[in-house]
């Protein structure tokens, strides 16, 4: 059988279109930067890697920011934006300092301004009768908008648990979900962060007590078999991404979720990688509105052709 002369060109065009759709997709990441404070800020090699990781993402959650002077994010903006006029500029939104007693951390979202904007935000208040103060660091809930993605609006609920109370904190995210829905008219949710959701902190028998896992409307993108830790001596799926909402679940780019091994990507030794963090980032992509529309048209066309043949 001979190939039509246009076949190679058509194949190349299809590959180009697929690559373009992947490029247009919005990459969302979650990264526990491990004790991100003054000492790490002075480690230039580690900071260079952190900036590279942030630049890979269109929107990234940064956790374990420990900086009472609030200099970390302004410093990052200076490194990301510089003084020149760039086509891509970054902005951020950051929580207040959260935690019990004197130990405090902050959540921060860094995002590309031309792709993402913040609609509104609030700190979840964990004051339920008989079940108070479950979270070590209450979620800093942010409602984002992106005009370029198939799903235009989505809420991100970040969480960094205390290892010993991970099971209860992860389960409590369902109450956060209910609270957000009662305040905002939105159905598309992303729960992401360092859940400490693996190994001894969340043993297999504990999953049956976690509503975020047992309720099928919550879709886990990072599976139990993943390793989000840098140390070779450990293999634990601590960092997770969970979605809720049919629209956002359907908008995920196939095979886009996973762990970003920056040690391998940037050819670092384990010691050099640990200077950056003891966690690898986790990520996934949301389809662009153009890709999503074209995919729906393609499916519709295939169905029509199939119907015509019957």
Swiss-Prot record:
Region ranges (Not required for free DNA-nuclease activity but required for activity towards liposome-coated DNA): 289-310
Protein modification: Poly-ADP-ribosylated by PARP1. ADP-ribosylation negatively regulates enzymatic activity during apoptosis.
Predominant location: nucleus
PROSITE patterns cross-referenced by the UniProt entry: DNASE_I_1, DNASE_I_2
Function in brief: Has DNA hydrolytic activity. Is capable of both single- and double-stranded DNA cleavage, producing DNA fragments with 3'-OH ends. Can cleave chromatin to nucleosomal units and cleaves nucleosomal and liposome-coated DNA. Acts in internucleosomal DNA fragmentation (INDF) during apoptosis and necrosis. The role in apoptosis includes myogenic and neuronal differentiation, and BCR-mediated clonal deletion of self-reactive B cells. Is active on chromatin in apoptotic cell-derived membrane-coated microparticles and thus suppresses anti-DNA autoimmunity.
EC number: 3.1.21.-
SUPFAM superfamilies tied to this protein: DNase I-like (SSF56219)
Motif (Bipartite nuclear localization signal): 40-56
Regulation of protein activity: Inhibited by zinc. Inhibited by heparin and proteolysis by plasmin.
Disrupted-gene phenotype: Mice develop symptoms of the autoimmune disease systemic lupus erythematosus, characterized by high titers of anti-nuclear autoantibodies (ANA) directed against nucleosomes and double-stranded DNA, the deposition of immune complexes in glomeruli and full-blown glomerulonephritis. Mice lacking both Dnase1 and Dnase1l3 show vascular occlusions following bacterial infection: defects are caused by the formation of intravascular neutrophil extracellular traps (NETs) clots that obstruct blood vessels and cause organ damage.
Disulfide bonds: 199-236
Motif (Nuclear localization signal): 301-307
Residue numbers annotated as active site: 105, 160
GO term, biological process aspect, one: DNA catabolic process
InterPro entries attached to this UniProt entry: Deoxyribonuclease-1_AS, DNase_I, DNASE_I_2, Endo/exonu/phosph_ase_sf, Endo/exonuclease/phosphatase
Compartments (UniProt record): Nucleus; Endoplasmic reticulum; Secreted
MF-aspect GO terms: DNA binding; DNA endonuclease activity; endonuclease activity
Signal peptide stretch: 1-25
Record's keyword terms, sorted: ADP-ribosylation, Apoptosis, Calcium, Disulfide bond, Endonuclease, Endoplasmic reticulum, Hydrolase, Necrosis, Nuclease, Nucleus, Secreted, Signal
Species of provenance: Mus musculus (Mouse)
GO cellular component: endoplasmic reticulum; extracellular region; nucleus
Tissues and organs where the protein is expressed, per its UniProt entry: Expressed at high levels in liver, spleen and testes. Expressed at lower levels in heart, lungs, skeletal muscle and kidney. Not expressed in brain. Predominantly expressed in macrophages; at protein level. Secreted by mononuclear phagocytes.
Obligatory cofactor(s): Ca(2+); Mg(2+)
Name the UniProt record assigns to this protein: Deoxyribonuclease gamma
Family statement drawn from the similarity comment of this UniProt entry: Belongs to the DNase I family.
């Amino acid at each position: 059988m001979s190939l039509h002369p246009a076949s190679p060109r058509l194949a190349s065009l299809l590959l180009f279109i697929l690559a373009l759709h992947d490029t247009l997709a919005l990459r969302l990441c979650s990264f526990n930067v491990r004790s991100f404070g003054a000492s790490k800020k002075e480690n230039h090699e580690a900071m260079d890697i952190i900036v590279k990781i942030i630049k890979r993402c269109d929107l990234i959650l940064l956790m374990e920011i420990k900086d009472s002077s609030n200099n970390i994010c302004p410093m990052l903006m200076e490194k990301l934006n510089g003084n020149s006029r760039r086509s891509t500029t970054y902005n951020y939104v950051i929580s207040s300092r959260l935690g019990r007693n004197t130990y405090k951390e902050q959540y921060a979202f860094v995002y590309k301004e031309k792709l993402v904007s913040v609609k509104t935000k609030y700190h979840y208040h964990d004051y339920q009768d008989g079940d108070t103060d479950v979270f070590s660091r209450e979620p800093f809930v942010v409602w984002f908008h992106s005009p370029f993605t198939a799903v235009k609006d989505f809420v991100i609920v970040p969480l960094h648990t205390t290892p010993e109370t991970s099971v209860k904190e992860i389960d409590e995210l369902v109450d956060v979900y209910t609270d957000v829905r009662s305040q905002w008219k939105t159905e598309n949710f992303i729960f992401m962060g360092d859940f400490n959701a693996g190994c001894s902190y969340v043993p297999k028998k504990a999953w049956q007590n976690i509503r975020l896992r047992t309720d099928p409307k919550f879709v886990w993108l990072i599976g139990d078999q993943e390793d989000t830790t840098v140390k070779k001596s450990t293999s634990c799926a601590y960092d997770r991404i969970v979605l809720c909402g049919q629209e956002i679940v359907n908008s995920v780019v196939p095979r886009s979720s996973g762990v970003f091994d920056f040690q391998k990507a940037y050819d670092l030794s384990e010691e050099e990688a640990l200077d950056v963090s003891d966690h690898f980032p986790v990520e996934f992509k949301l389809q662009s509105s153009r890709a999503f529309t074209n995919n729906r048209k393609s499916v519709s066309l295939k169905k029509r052709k199939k119907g015509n043949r019957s």
